[in-house]
């Protein structure tokens, strides 16, 4: 079964940047995109994801709230919260809900490091 990654950001350009970085590292992984938390949760209820890459600042529920809800659905799933807001409080709150904080603009190096840590946690082949 294909490794499924949920990418959530209200900005199409940001989703494209995240997808590009992910594809460069893991071209065989299936990417599914959503524009907001409600859409993401609807997709998550249709079938499980192996990883989630979430924007922090979105209309409606933010990435922190979405990360917490996704962790309830799939405990232990690697989740990254991606934001240009580098406040310590945001980073700490991300960790509190079981997410890893990645700064925007997202670099391929940061994505690679996150995937490596996720591979180690999940025992994913190719990690």
Task: Label every PLM stretch briefly.
Residues 55:
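Active-site residues of response regulator receiver
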Residues 58:
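Receiver (REC) domain active-site loop signature in two-component systems and cognate sites
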Residues 65, 86-102, 113:
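Alpha4 helix (beta4-alpha4-beta5 surface) of REC/receiver domains from two-component response regulators
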């Amino acid at each position: 079964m294909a490794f499924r990654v949920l990418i959530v950001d209200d900005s199409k350009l940001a989703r494209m940047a995240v997808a590009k970085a992910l594809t460069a590292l893991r071209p065989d992984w299936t990417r599914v995109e959503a524009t907001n938390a409600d859409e993401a949760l609807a997709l998550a209820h249709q079938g499980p994801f192996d990883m989630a890459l979430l924007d922090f600042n979105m209309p409606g529920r933010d990435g922190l709230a979405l990360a917490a809800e996704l962790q309830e659905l799939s405990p232990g799933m690697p989740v990254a919260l991606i934001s240009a807001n580098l406040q310590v409080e945001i980073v700490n709150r991300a960790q509190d809900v079981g997410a890893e904080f990645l700064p925007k603009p997202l670099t391929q190096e940061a994505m690679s490091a996150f995937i490596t840590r996720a591979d180690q946690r999940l025992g994913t082949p190719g990690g």
